[in-house]
Amino acid sequence: MCESELEMSSESESQTKEDESESEEESTEEESTESEEVREAKEAVLEKYKNLGMITGVRNYLNMRKGPSTDYEICGVIFKNCAVEILEEKDGWMKIESGGATGYVSAEYVTTGEKARKLALSSMKYMAEILTDSVDALYEPKEGAEVITTFLKGERYDINGETKDWVEIEAVTELSGYVKRETVYTGYFLDEAIYFSLDGVSETRQDLIRKAFEYYGGTYVWGGKQLTAEGGVDCSGYTMCLYKLFGVQLPEFSGAQAEVGMTVDEDTIRPGDLIFYVGRYPGVIGHVAIYIGNGKIIHAASESKGICVSSWKYGPPVIMKNVMGD
């Protein structure tokens, strides 16, 4: 087994197969109830792939590496039901392209052929992609409304609602923002790999980032402080519990955590540093996330998203902190 996967017992492997079987049944049912317009839109997405693969059989994530063995450096991560373009296969490894990055993964965890196509169709998400260099997300769907944050070109967000002129998208944790329809493309997308580089980053910070990904997909619970399947965490509970594993003591709340450590900026921030954001109330810190590199963060985002990866500028950063003491 590739060292990049979390260890799975035979019981959990069996469960994975059951999950995949259920997924296929759900896919068939969904396809039969979808409109012709939706089916055509989804099929158009698949046409972009010459040799489609879908990641399956992993509990949390799979590491992408710079070469075809576990001896090579990790260059990104890819999650269950993510789509990849298969470039070549040799000696149990596949060279893939996904999310704008190229790397190698164990072929054992890549589903191909008709199964991949069906899984892809059932896994697509209806989202909004930013078309212009920057777009202001507004509190209300009207010109001159207060700005929540600014989105950047190429970023994708869940859609909470649509009208003729406006698209409502999740802007900040549990808070929707409105953008003009002509500034976004709305359509179906497949999840892809997340690329980042840990070159020049200390072993401790690398271990912290890898540990953070072990909880990807975990449950968001307001006020939660348990990094377990039965428990759950909120944004500050996630950072507090995670950093404690590495000897860093953080307060319970994001506002208090922002008082810890040394301030950094966009030029000096490193994977493992914390980024703090405004929450529901303008001017008040209400959210914290872990910077993982390449403009991405991992955080306990909301009840609907759980622990996930986002653009680091999904909301306006208030302050960035090095709490590692290095």
Q: What is the predicted function of each stretch?
A:
Residues 1-51, 85, 98-126, 170-206:
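Boundary regions of SH3-family modules and the immediately adjacent low-complexity/disordered segments
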Residues 2-13, 22, 41, 47, ...:
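Beta-loop motif signature
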Residues 53-63, 125-137, 240-255, 291-293:
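Short, basic/aromatic beta-hairpin or loop at an interaction surface
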Residues 68-72, 145, 202-206, 229-234, ...:
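Soluble non-cytosolic domains of exported or imported proteins
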Residues 91-95, 164-168, 295-296:
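Short aromatic-glycine-enriched beta-strand elements
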Residues 194-200, 220-229, 278:
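Second-shell loop/turn segments in exported
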Residues 219-271, 318:
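Catalytic cysteine-centered active-site loop
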Residues 248-309, 313, 326:
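...with weaker cross-activation on analogous glycine-rich loops/strands in unrelated enzymes
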